[in-house]
Amino acid sequence: MAQRLPWRFVAEWTSEGEMVLREVKRIYAAGATRYQEYMIAELAGIGKALVLDGKVQSSILDEHWYHEALVHPILLAHQCPRKVLVIGGGEGATVREVLRHSCVEHVTMVDIDEELVELAKKHLAEWHQGAFSSDKLELVIGDGRRYVENCHRKYDAIILDLVDPMEGGPAARLYTLEFYRAVKGCLRPGGAVVTQATSPTLSPRVYAVIRNTLAKVFTIVRPYVSYVRSYNGLWGFVAASDTVDPAKLSAKEVDELIAARIRGQLRFYDGETHEWMFRLPLPVRQVLSETRDYATDEKPVYVPV
């Protein structure tokens, strides 16, 4: 049963000296797994949301602005992605979007936090919409980095739906040169990878470093953005491949591909939106052009807060 609470807030740091307060209207589940603290709650302004280690990871208001932006550009740019690997994405919405594609025959989802996945199955049905029950899904509980380093399968697309690289957190190892080399080793010829890449406005250097690190491994690297109110502004992604280039798709081509290959009605992504996402604002382009650093296991990148 949902629990009604007196006055309470989620206080989320967005940058040094700046935070967002959201009133907690109702808590559905809260506690800690082996890997992270969690809360599934109704929050003022954004509705039902998943909060991990004090940061809003996803909300019912605009989760589709994130998940559709993460998944569809590289899958539509690929000729026909049959096998897809998802690292992270514990709430199931990324797999939900992958399974919309008629080409997809098999999805492997690797998440380290089994407790959180079970909580998502129970409390976040609006997100996964039954995706965990699909015959096409293989759910692997384990370390995403270890999985790709020991990968015996080849995938057409790899989607990295990760938490931010925080100092002391497990995800920083999933944004390094060594990790991206291992990811490339899991791709079939003509394959592509996409990663969430933090905020180009709140952590612009981190966004640029992630782009630069992927550029050390792949010949085609395309940074792009979406707007996610729950994340307090623009949110960044980077697609990478040696052959697949989503930025070359026109609005007309995207709309035709959606009609031909995607089941059901999308709520955020279409051809016009696709073109907008790859047209980065001038300040973001400036940071990308000025930043030379890249991340390694020895020198990882971290979000400021």
UniProtKB/Swiss-Prot annotation:
Involved in the biosynthesis of polyamines which are thought to support the growth of thermophilic microorganisms under high-temperature conditions. It seems that long-chain and branched-chain of polyamines effectively stabilize DNA and RNA, respectively. Catalyzes the irreversible transfer of a propylamine group from the amino donor S-adenosylmethioninamine (decarboxy-AdoMet) to 1,3-diaminopropane to yield sym-norspermidine (bis(3-aminopropyl)amine). It can also synthesize thermospermine from spermidine with a very low activity. The keyword Heme does not apply. It is found in: Cytoplasm. It comes from Hyperthermus butylicus (strain DSM 5456 / JCM 9403 / PLM1-5). Its main location: cytoplasm. Homodimer or homotetramer. PANTHER family: THERMOSPERMINE SYNTHASE ACAULIS5. This is Polyamine aminopropyltransferase 2. Spermidine binds at residues 67, 91. Belongs to the spermidine/spermine synthase family. GO terms for biological process: polyamine biosynthetic process; spermidine biosynthetic process. S-methyl-5'-thioadenosine binds at residues 36, 111, 143-144, 170. It catalyses: S-adenosyl 3-(methylsulfanyl)propylamine + propane-1,3-diamine = norspermidine + S-methyl-5'-thioadenosine + H(+). InterPro entries: PABS, PABS_CS, SAM-dependent_MTases_sf, Spermi_synthase, Spermidine_synt_N_sf. Keywords: Cytoplasm, Polyamine biosynthesis, Transferase. Residues 7-242 form the PABS domain. GO terms for cellular component: cytoplasm. The keyword Nucleus does not apply. It comes from the Archaea. Its EC number is 2.5.1.23. GO terms for molecular function: spermidine synthase activity; sym-norspermidine synthase activity; thermospermine synthase activity.
